[in-house]
Each structure stands twice: as C-alpha cells, then as structure tokens.
Amino acid sequence: MANLHWEKLMSDIIEVKDLVEVYSDGTKAVDNISFNVKEGEFFGFLGPNGAGKSTTIKILTTLLRKTSGQVTVAGHDTDTDASDIRKIIGVQSQETTVDGDLTGRENLTLQGHFQQMETSKIKKRVNELLKLVELQSAADKRARNYSGGMKKRLDLATALIHEPRLLFLDEPTTGLDPQSRTAIWTYLQKLNKEEGTTIFLTTQYLEEADKLCQRLSIIDFGKIVASGSPAELKRQVGADSIQVALENCEKDKPQAKALLKSMTEVTEVIETSEECLTVYAKNGGVLIADIVRALDSSDIRLKSVTFSSPSLDDVFMRHTGRRIRTEELVKAPSRMFGSGRR
C-alpha cells in the first residue's frame, strides 16, 4: 500500500507543455507555458487579474480549445478526450452556480442526478457534503436566502458530489469576508489531506497560495515567471524588503537609488511603480534608520518606508518589477514607518 501511495504522489495528473491560447482579436492570453501537477497535490496558480489564470483553467476543464501545445489530464487529451476528463473532475468557477429557488439539499441532489449517480448513493453523499461544509442546519432552506459565504460552500459541495479525483477551483474565495475565506480553506485542506483529492487552485490572494499550496506557479501577462513551493520561492528572494516611497519620485529616484546601492548591507535596489524603490537587504529591519538618515542628509524628501520579510509578493516583484495589487488582495500585515500614506 505504501508503494502504491508513493507512486500516486509521483505520477502527474496534469501535464501542460508549450500551451498557447490566442483569442480571435489577436490577444495572446496564454503565452507558451509549461507545468505539471502531481496526483494528490495541492497546486496553486497565482497571479493578478488578467494574467491568464482563468483561461488556463478553462482549457484544463475542456471548456476552451487550446490554440497550440500539449495538455493532458489523467492521460487524456483535453481536445479529443473531453468526455473522459469530465467524469473525473469537479469544477468551481468564480461565480456561484447554485439555483436560488432550490434548497441546499435539492441543489446537491440535482447535481448528483446530472452526474448519473445512483439515488441511494446521492442521498448518502449529500449528507456527507452538508456536514463537510457545515450546512446541515440550512440544508432545507432555499439557497437564495443563503449568505455569500454559504453559497460558496454549497457551490464547493456541488463540485464534490461525484467524488472527483481532481478538483479545479477558480478563485473560490473572491469577495468573501475573512471568516468565510478561512472556513473554505479548512474544507479544502481536509479534502486534500484526508481524501487525497488533487486540487488545482487559481488565486490572486498571496496568503491563500502561501497557506494552502504545496507547489505553485506564478503567472503574469500569460507567462509563468516562477514555480516552486512557497518556501522555496521565498528563499530565492533571500533578503528582507524595504519599500521606499519618495515625495518626488521622478526627480529624486536616480540619486536615491545610487545612494541606497552604495550602502554595504544592501544587496539590490529595484525601481517600482508603486513605492518608487524597493531595497533588498539582510536584516533589513535594522537598516531602516540608516536609510532615513542617508536620504535626509541628501535633502531627499521621504514619504514612507515599509519593511517586510520575504513574501510571495516579493517573489512576484523580483520577476516582474511590480507588486500584485488588487482591491481584494490579502497580505500579511507589514510594519509602516513614516508619516506618509501608501
């Protein structure tokens, strides 16, 4: 049994090679990407809105034909073996698909019939899922009366009704409050660890990818810019980051950059569109006072200085020159120094 389990973890359930997707207007939504997902893995696809995440997941779930490249799911080609793939996958899209006129139990039962499950098995599975997503008390209430978080949980349950080998989640927690988001995380971790379900998650939330995913790929403008475990990717950054915002960024940036690069503790200085400059340094926390004094002595007006330990946002910026910024972005709090606002 142990050997079989190991073989399962070592085998690829998703294989993508040189995938390209070009829309009819000429837009290249996915630009020659390659990656693999192992069976039993919790894999993340991290990137800002418009990066190509949803397009990729549509191809993987057979909803969109690729322009070129090779894509297989459980050994089946996404273009020629769509029906075989759909039997073994579950999909939760960004928008909830529950029927508000039906109760939670009725929504799940209907989905079971769509999957051509036996009636006796449907009843048992519905009860299991209602317990999993903690909707037993609301099971016989119409879904239109559910909160946003409850609808998301019901939507997740419908994707699991037929016990799929592989679950695709396209930004499943977008728009949820922190409590509901944390609850979804708990269910997903349980599915992956206790039931061995392979999970492919697209997300724009840094904390979500960091907490849940064993491995991930970061995508931007249709290209994969980095891949690895969250810990590996953060180790590649290797240093603390200090975001330096100047009152007059365009005027003072060249002088400030040269000044900061001359400091012996600094390993790298990158120009960014948000904070003006990002400084990488070992033990960056103790360097902040020196940065403030150095800029002040050169009559460079400082707006703010923000310090943080290596994060996935730093990984993204290292590869793209900017940060992942969206209204819904969730990041660990960082410490702010200075009187200015970000």
Q: What is the meaning of each model-derived region?
A:
Residues 2-7, 283-342:
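C-terminal coupling/interaction segments
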